[in-house]
């Protein structure tokens, strides 16, 4: 029986952030590549079309494991426990953190998804 894309995706979803980081590094070493997004070159200056360097992390759904999501929100925002709980329990979508560099936002997003939340960038 061959491994399908769905099997791989399911396995990746079950991995922790640190395990995913190690996997990316192993793939980079094994295939002698660098995991970075390709950049398309436009004919003229297209500054307005460029991807933003900073984003706001929006919590769209806390999921079924609110306690885990609250812990992550508390950790990444520096809020107290009650303030983090109010943020998660409040009206969604809500900005968890604003003006975050893409690299940091990806790490925070992975933590929130691992805790069971749904997240998007704005």
From Swiss-Prot:
GO cellular component: cytosolic large ribosomal subunit
GO molecular function terms attached to this record: mRNA binding; structural constituent of ribosome
Keyword list, A-Z: Ribonucleoprotein, Ribosomal protein
Disulfide bonds: none
InterPro entries for this protein: Ribosomal_bL12, Ribosomal_bL12_C, Ribosomal_bL12_C/ClpS-like, Ribosomal_bL12_oligo, Ribosomal_bL12_oligo_N_sf
Biological processes, Gene Ontology terms: translation
Subunit structure of this chain's protein: Homodimer. Part of the ribosomal stalk of the 50S ribosomal subunit. Forms a multimeric L10(L12)X complex, where L10 forms an elongated spine to which 2 to 4 L12 dimers bind in a sequential fashion. Binds GTP-bound translation factors.
Entry similarity comment: Belongs to the bacterial ribosomal protein bL12 family.
Function, in words: Forms part of the ribosomal stalk which helps the ribosome interact with GTP-bound translation factors. Is thus essential for accurate translation.
Protein name (database record): Large ribosomal subunit protein bL12
Gene transcribed to yield this protein: rplL
């Amino acid at each position: 029986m061959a491994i399908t894309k769905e099997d791989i995706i399911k396995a990746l979803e079950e991995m922790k952030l640190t395990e995913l980081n190690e996997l990316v590094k192993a793939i980079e070493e094994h295939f002698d590549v660098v995991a970075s997004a390709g950049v398309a070159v436009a004919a003229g200056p297209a500054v307005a079309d460029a991807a933003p360097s900073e984003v706001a992390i929006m919590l769209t759904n806390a999921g079924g494991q609110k306690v885990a999501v609250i812990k992550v929100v508390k950790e990444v925002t520096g809020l107290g426990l009650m303030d983090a709980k109010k943020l998660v329990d409040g009206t969604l979508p809500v900005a968890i953190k604003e003006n975050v560099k893409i690299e940091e936002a990806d790490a925070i997003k992975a933590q929130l998804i691992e805790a069971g939340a749904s997240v998007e960038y704005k």
